[in-house]
Amino acid sequence: MAKQKIRIRLKAFEHRILDQSADKIVETAKRTGASISGPIPLPTERTLYTVLRSPHKHKDSREQFEMRTHKRLIDIVNPTPKTVDSLMKLDLPSGVDIEIKL
């Protein structure tokens, strides 16, 4: 029988919230008897926006805004039905984007 694997990718702008969510997922998976690898920190995506400070004049005066997207990867190997059920019921903060691949 082939090994099953659940791959969870987490994305958030705040790294503290992201790490707390990853810890909750890891704790839940370990409690239900699944083996786990991660959380693995993935490269932070940095988006830079440059805008003019004044509405129509002074092109040399600009302001830069930065948006950082932090990412983590968690692999759950050989999940039990109890693991999947408890992960579905897990309550995570609204600022965390979750992608799950089976």
UniProtKB/Swiss-Prot annotation:
GO BP annotations, alphabetical order: translation
UniProt keyword annotations, A-Z: Ribonucleoprotein, Ribosomal protein
Keyword Ribosomal protein: yes
PROSITE patterns: RIBOSOMAL_S10
SMART domains to which the protein is assigned, alphabetical: Ribosomal_S10 (SM01403)
Cellular compartments per GO CC: ribonucleoprotein complex; ribosome
Annotated InterPro entries: Ribosomal_uS10, Ribosomal_uS10_CS, Ribosomal_uS10_dom, Ribosomal_uS10_dom_sf
Gene Ontology terms, MF aspect: structural constituent of ribosome; tRNA binding
Coiled coil: none
Cysteine disulfide partners in this protein: none
Function in brief: Involved in the binding of tRNA to the ribosomes.
Family in the record: Belongs to the universal ribosomal protein uS10 family.
Subunit annotation: Part of the 30S ribosomal subunit.
Protein name as annotated: Small ribosomal subunit protein uS10
Species this protein is from: Latilactobacillus sakei subsp. sakei (strain 23K) (Lactobacillus sakei subsp. sakei)
Organism placement in taxonomy: Bacteria, Bacillati, Bacillota, Bacilli, Lactobacillales
